[in-house]
């Protein structure tokens, strides 16, 4: 059944609304649906429906699962540099295999693709070269719209909206190389809890989701940081004081 734009979006018609979102070229209609989907940012079922729809239409490549992604949700509005991309590059330099998934900025000034472009690192789509990069350099960058054409269809409207949307929660769940390890920063407790639920449902071997108590979607040097970490199928919660890190500065 085709979704009608004047119909309230519910959990039960979310699939039809999402299908229409990616089929229509009407920016106003796209914005209306995205704003309604934002009401379900803390609903794991709706997030999974959106994720699965985007994945279904993706460009599939052979997985390189023994890798780590540092893709976070972004959108904390604090105008920091792109820390997740910086961390990815640093980790790869000490031989941690990094499959960094990312996109251009939608609600900030420095998306991962913006940073990678400035560094003249090529965003690959070719499966052979992606795997060669992982073996040789321990790093490859995965530009989301190359693999997920549906994300390209909403790039313009997301830029017009200029605030964090439900799509901020998609990147960390859609690594094209199937990275089985994830470190993920997000903005607050509720975001961390919902991302923990989502990552638990997509069969990662291990992950750590964290938020800082000052609103930073990274580990803060100025306030405590709470972690939700999965190891051996168990999820543990731990809060670490910023003073722990400050003693190393």
What are these regions (language model features)?
Residues 73-76, 112, 172, 186:
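Gly/Ser/Thr-rich helix-start
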Residues 33, 82-137:
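A glycine-rich phosphate/pyrophosphate-binding beta-strand-loop-alpha-helix module
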Residues 64-71, 99-105, 167-170:
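Core alpha/beta catalytic barrel or barrel-like domain that forms the active/cofactor pocket
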Residues 72-77, 102-108, 147, 213-214:
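Acidic, glycine-rich active-site loops and adjacent beta-strand->loop/helix elements
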Residues 2-4, 9, 59, 80, ...:
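Glycine-rich anion-binding loops and their surrounding alpha/beta cores
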Residues 10-15, 26-30, 43-47, 51, ...:
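Generic structural signal for well-ordered, non-membrane alpha-helical segments
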Residues 1-80, 94:
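Acidic, glycine/proline-rich low-complexity segments that act as flexible tails and inter-domain linkers
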Residues 15-19, 31-35, 48-55, 85-92, ...:
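Predominant activation on well-ordered alpha-helical scaffold segments within soluble catalytic domains
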């Amino acid at each position: 059944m085709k979704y009608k734009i004047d119909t309230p979006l519910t959990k039960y018609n979310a699939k039809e609304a999402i299908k229409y979102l990616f089929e229509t070229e009407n920016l106003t209609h796209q914005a209306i649906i995205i704003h309604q989907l934002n009401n379900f940012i803390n609903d794991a079922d709706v997030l999974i429906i959106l994720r699965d729809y985007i994945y279904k239409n993706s460009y599939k490549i052979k997985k390189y699962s023994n890798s780590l992604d540092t893709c976070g949700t972004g959108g904390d509005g604090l105008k920091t540099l792109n820390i997740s991309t910086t961390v990815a590059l640093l980790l790869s330099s000490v031989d941690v295999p990094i499959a960094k998934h990312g996109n251009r900025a939608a609600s900030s000034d420095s998306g991962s693709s913006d940073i990678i472009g400035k560094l003249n690192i090529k965003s690959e789509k070719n499966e052979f070269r992606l795997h060669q990069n992982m073996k040789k350099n321990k790093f490859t960058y995965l530009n989301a719209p190359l693999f997920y054409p549906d994300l390209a269809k909403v790039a313009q409207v997301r830029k017009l909206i200029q605030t964090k949307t439900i799509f901020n929660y998609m990147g960390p769940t859609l690594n094209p190389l199937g990275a089985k390890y994830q470190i993920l920063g997000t903005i607050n407790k509720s975001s961390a809890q919902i991302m923990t639920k989502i990552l638990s449902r997509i069969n990662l071997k291990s992950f750590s989701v964290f938020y800082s108590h000052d609103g930073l979607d990274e580990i803060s040097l100025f306030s405590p940081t709470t972690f939700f970490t999965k190891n051996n199928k168990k999820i543990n919660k731990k809060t670490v004081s910023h003073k722990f890190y400050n003693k190393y500065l």
